[in-house]
């Protein structure tokens, strides 16, 4: 028979009483009234906040967007195939946030920063709100450093600065993504961290971009956020904010970042779908009334930070697709009014064989020469004017039968200047190469070379300077100025090379 020791029983009970902690947790619970098309209507969530995350009993997470008198409209993050009417929902007390950090470099993630490239989990010890407030006026300083794209047409005539927001706009299949990916490739060795956000793209297109960046060694400083065409509208809507949050981590740590949103038209369409399903009143083109705020709060997060905050920067290159070149549609006009300029890509120019197909007449940078080094300002000043005059003369010359010699010379010069702006995809040029190329065209050294030989001569010139005259590149990179020494060196190099080139052509 077991003997009961009262002292021991008392001691055990006392220990258990000491350990016991009474926790009273109040959970705000509701019931699903209706679910479908990525939207759930919930009854009973009386204390829910706007934008708060809610958790359904089968594990799906949603965001409470519509707070109405008798129900709450929530958008679902994911498929939620097992979610049914009558299921219980509880509030989490949290706003959507994601992990951020250096571990994301070289990875492909979704809108919730979960890896989708099959390379395992990402170690991260910091989180950021997906929707963070933009830096205030005092936190910023004016844009004054160039962000080189490697494309002559942009760096010379529509310069982009670190902290600027420059819209890339054009019809489908005019090379918008190519301009963006070339800009990423050109940041190699520049200390700029790039974030490419693919919204509603084909999975094959995103895969192609990843392959290009990996081949060129650009993935080591790039993060890709991808929500493909088959993703839910909620995740497509969140993807750009996730990209901005990932870039902000680096910006507030004193780094320079570049974010590409490809493209915001698809994000607006996803938001329109969500809003219509939530029964919000439609406005112009059936978009909701706050579609301007959708993009403004995203693009205002791009900034050049003040010295006190570490001088970091976030440059935004949003992409918007137009229909038949119509820039007066709702979304294009909204984004044009938010950004600091636009690069307009034309289908007609693209089809005429000029790539990148930038319409220099309509494109503009509101930062201007503040985002150029002195060397570029010195040579590129006349380029835009000469091209504008050429475009006018070219249109006029189609109607005129006999043109005087001066007009013919100007037309010949303009055709060669347009030729030097052509660049194959994925071959960005350094600043020194661009300065040499523009100087050659502006000063008439290409005038007596046949039009079809211009690109061949320029390629040869750039190779010759890089291999035989490294001093030129050193001067430009060190002083950022097109000095007299650099000009003389370049002039004699062009003259010598031209003689040999002409002999070979003959």
Swiss-Prot record:
The keyword Metal-binding does not apply. PANTHER family: ATP SYNTHASE SUBUNIT ALPHA, MITOCHONDRIAL. PROSITE patterns: ATPASE_ALPHA_BETA. Keywords: ATP synthesis, ATP-binding, CF(1), Chloroplast, Hydrogen ion transport, Ion transport, Membrane, Nucleotide-binding, Plastid, Thylakoid, Translocase, Transport. F-type ATPases have 2 components, CF(1) - the catalytic core - and CF(0) - the membrane proton channel. CF(1) has five subunits: alpha(3), beta(3), gamma(1), delta(1), epsilon(1). CF(0) has four main subunits: a, b, b' and c. InterPro entries: ATP_synth_asu-like_sf (IPR023366), ATP_synth_asu_C (IPR000793), ATP_synth_asu_C_sf (IPR038376), ATP_synth_F1_a_nt-bd_dom (IPR033732), ATP_synth_F1_asu (IPR005294), ATPase_a/bsu_AS (IPR020003), ATPase_F1/V1/A1_a/bsu_N (IPR004100), ATPase_F1/V1/A1_a/bsu_N_sf (IPR036121). The record marks 363 as: Required for activity. One of its GO terms (cellular component) is proton-transporting ATP synthase complex. It catalyses: ATP + H2O + 4 H(+)(in) = ADP + phosphate + 5 H(+)(out). It is a peripheral membrane protein. Its EC number is 7.1.2.2. Belongs to the ATPase alpha/beta chains family. Produces ATP from ADP in the presence of a proton gradient across the membrane. The alpha chain is a regulatory subunit. This is ATP synthase subunit alpha, chloroplastic. It is found in: Plastid, Chloroplast thylakoid membrane. The gene is atpA. It holds the Pfam family ATP-synt_ab_C. It comes from Euglena gracilis. SUPFAM superfamilies: C-terminal domain of alpha and beta subunits of F1 ATP synthase (SSF47917), N-terminal domain of alpha and beta subunits of F1 ATP synthase (SSF50615), P-loop containing nucleoside triphosphate hydrolases (SSF52540). ATP binds at residues 170-177. GO terms for molecular function: ADP binding; ATP binding; proton-transporting ATP synthase activity, rotational mechanism. It comes from the Eukaryota.
């Amino acid at each position: 028979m077991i003997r009961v020791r009262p002292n021991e029983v008392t001691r055990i009970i006392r220990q258990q009483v000491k350990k016991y902690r009474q926790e009273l947790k109040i959970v705000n619970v509701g019931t699903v009234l209706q679910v479908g098309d990525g939207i759930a209507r919930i009854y009973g969530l009386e204390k829910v906040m706007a934008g708060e995350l809610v958790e359904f009993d089968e594990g799906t997470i949603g965001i409470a967007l519509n707070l109405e008198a008798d129900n709450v409209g929530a958008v679902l993050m994911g498929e939620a195939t097992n979610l049914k009417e009558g299921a219980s929902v509880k509030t989490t007390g949290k706003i959507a946030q994601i992990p951020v950090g250096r571990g994301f470099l070289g990875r492909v993630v979704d809108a919730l920063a979960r890896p989708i490239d099959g390379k395992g989990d990402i170690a991260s010890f910091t989180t950021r709100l997906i929707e963070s407030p933009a830096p205030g006026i005092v936190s910023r300083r004016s844009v004054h450093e160039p962000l080189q794209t490697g494309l002559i047409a942009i760096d010379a005539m529509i310069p982009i600065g670190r902290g600027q927001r420059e819209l890339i706009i054009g019809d489908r299949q005019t090379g918008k993504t190519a301009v963006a990916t070339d800009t990423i490739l050109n940041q190699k060795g520049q200390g700029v961290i790039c974030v490419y956000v693919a919204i509603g793209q084909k999975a094959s297109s995103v895969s192609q971009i990843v392959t290009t960046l990996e081949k060129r060694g650009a993935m080591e400083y790039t993060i890709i956020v991808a929500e493909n065409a088959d993703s839910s509208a909620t995740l497509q809507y969140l993807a750009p904010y996730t990209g901005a949050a990932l870039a902000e981590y680096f910006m507030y740590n004193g780094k320079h970042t570049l974010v590409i949103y490809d493209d915001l038209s698809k994000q607006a369409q996803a938001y329109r779908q969500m809003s219509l399903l939530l029964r919000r009143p439609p406005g112009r083109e059936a978009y909701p009334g706050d579609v301007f705020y959708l993009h403004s709060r995203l693009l205002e997060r791009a900034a050049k930070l003040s010295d006190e905050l570490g001088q970091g920067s976030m440059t935004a290159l949003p992409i918007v697709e137009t229909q038949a070149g119509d820039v007066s549609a709702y979304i294009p006009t909204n984004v044009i009014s938010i950004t600091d300029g636009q690069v307009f890509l034309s289908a007609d120019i693209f089809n005429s064989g000029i790539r990148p197909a930038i319409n220099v007449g309509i494109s503009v940078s509101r930062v201007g020469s503040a985002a150029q080094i002195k060397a570029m300002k010195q040579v590129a000043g006349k380029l835009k004017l000469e091209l504008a005059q050429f475009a006018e003369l070219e249109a006029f010359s189609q109607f005129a039968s006999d043109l005087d010699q001066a007009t013919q010379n100007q037309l010949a010069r303009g055709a060669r200047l347009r030729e030097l702006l052509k660049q194959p995809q994925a071959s960005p040029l350094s600043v020194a190469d661009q300065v040499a190329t523009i100087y050659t065209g502006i000063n008439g050294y290409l005038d007596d070379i046949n039009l079809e030989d211009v690109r061949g001569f320029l390629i040869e010139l750039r190779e010759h300077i890089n291999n035989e005259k490294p001093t030129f590149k050193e001067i430009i990179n060190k002083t950022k100025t097109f000095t007299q020494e650099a000009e003389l060196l370049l002039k004699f190099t062009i003259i010598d090379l031209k003689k040999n080139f002409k002999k070979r052509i003959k």
